[in-house]
Amino acid sequence: MRIGAFTAIAAFPLWAAAQTDWPAYGGGPAGTRYSNLTQIDRTNVSRLRVAWTYDTGEGRGDPQTQPIVINGVLFGVTPSHKVVALDAATGKLLWKFDSGIAGRGPDRGLVYWASGGDRRIFAAVQSFVYALDAATGKAIPDFGREGRIDLREDLGRDPAGQSIVLTTPGVVYRDLLIVGGRTPEALPAPPGDIRAYDVRSGKLRWSFHTIPHPGEFGYETWPKDAWQSSGAANNWAGMALDEKRGIVYVPTGSAASDFYGADRLGDDLFANTLLALNAATGERIWHFQGVKHDIWDRDFPSPPVLVTVRHDGHAVDAVAQTTKQGWVYLFDRATGKPLFPIEYRSYPRSEVPGEAAAGTQPLPTKPAPFARQSLTGEMLTNRTPEAHQWALERFRDLRSGGQFVPFSAGRETVIFPGFDGGAEWGGSAFDPATGLLYVNANDLAWTSSLAENQAGASGRQIYLTNCAVCHGDGMAGAPPQIPSLAGIGSRRTRAELTAIVRQGAGRMPSFPNLRARDVAALVEFLASGENKELAGEEPARVAPRYRFTGYHKFLDPNGYPAVAPPWGTLNAINLNTGEYAWKIPFGEYPELAAQGMKDTGTENYGGPIVTAGGLVFIAATNFDRKFHAFDKRSGKLLWETTLPMAGNATPATYQVNGKQYVVIYATGGKALPGEPGGGVYVAFALPGNASIGGRR
């Protein structure tokens, strides 16, 4: 078995004098994305200049990486999931690790652990987690098997038939690496067990079943023996760790299949749940389920943030969790008691045969939502009279009733905010000095529906069963998040398409359940449109009676959102009071701004950081490719610059040799086809002794 290749460019002392670091994804185990550095502040941020760049030299991917910085060394990931160590002051490459496994999907960061002279970087590549020597980049052979563990194992199912990848880094508690994983949106999918591995040996130390086994709490909220066949309820968004209390906070997503739950009737604990687990043992301490029996893909999409707030005159250690719907939930960290009341409200039942939507869902009474949650005709675009009229006519054909309206068979339903939030994977930042939580949000409407599956086995039916859940019946996708497959036969060879189906690519999982004949029929349908019937064959698996018809953005004929602005926002919420300090549109379409239509806000992917220097740094905006610095108290824009590609990631800040840097990974991972894409780390600092690392 190949462990992987590494390239050592220069040795470096990890035992050097202590620096002010960014030691973990989210800035630290609490995930506050806060730095106490003050060299760059409100008075001088306008003087920021590029200090160095590191160009990975790779093409478009969507890594979404926030680097970590330890003792003057920056550790990051390339679009193809190679791991790099850079001199954090110059951008000079120190070493590079190549697992030899192809990958282009999200890889949001790395995990660092040290004990004495043993210093390790844990890096995820597809279904594997590698332990690397932080000084050399070499895989550590006594971790797992030849330097890696396989996340498809230890799930109680045949590993060969599982698709699970680690897209967001886990956390380290003492000598345990605690991880979740991303699973497919539809069955078959593995269970979303939360697992802890020994950081030295790679042995599994504990596992928490998010789909409970017989005798475990929550088992009765699923059909009998669902643990053997149901899937997902997984943690893909990240975690937060209270090191003092020894509690890890784990938000989970929906159960598979996402949109039709006839085979998982019940509340489905612990899907869509914020879990507080004993980090040493995996035992449940408390939990809160945000969506019961989710049939809308309303995962908890962001890592929790551990905060301390003033509540009823007392300091309370709390955990804040943002949602796709635009809510912020706030709980006492130790007990799970909500700091603001939560009301259970009634919602309509599903009309789809076999489905049974939950009768009530929990909603916080404060803070108010940071995204709009119901669409009416008065809220449609006025960009042009023609766009408004088109949107109005289209809207009349849609079902729109606010949150938790079940999808129907045939007529499309509005989901607002859309499938990408509200909040997303970039997370939020918390300022302990002010009690303000900073969260960026998408504010677009999407639509979709269900359709009845047809009997038989053919290339098109295999597509509808396995692929249409994302790409839609007509293969249009929802660019830039989900690419169109129309005409893909002219862009990819059949061999390439076969490899993608087998191995996965980007957000797309692999499909190990499909037989060779199924894959061949599917590939032929994608490449040529030929709907090859598999005579005498049954489908590779029994499909559910109804399937999701795909993710459809509600856009006007010119490709702009069909709702009125703002289409993206940046929000500052006082968690002491539950009130908003400020809210601003976030992002622009350059072509609309040139026509005088400014401050519309846009889709944004990536999160903020906040500093003691009085600043909020954030890139994230899809179309203007800007990196911004805002006054954290007022929301006033103090500085911005245009990146080589959209910064669809979360920045980091650190100090080396007395100099503060702010770094962002520019990839264009969420950009539209034809827009720049690649992988460039860009570090900024105040003028003086700047250098250019160049392409490595």
Labelled PLM ranges:
Residues T43-G57, V83-G103, G116, V129-G161, ...:
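Extracytoplasmic/lumenal domain signature
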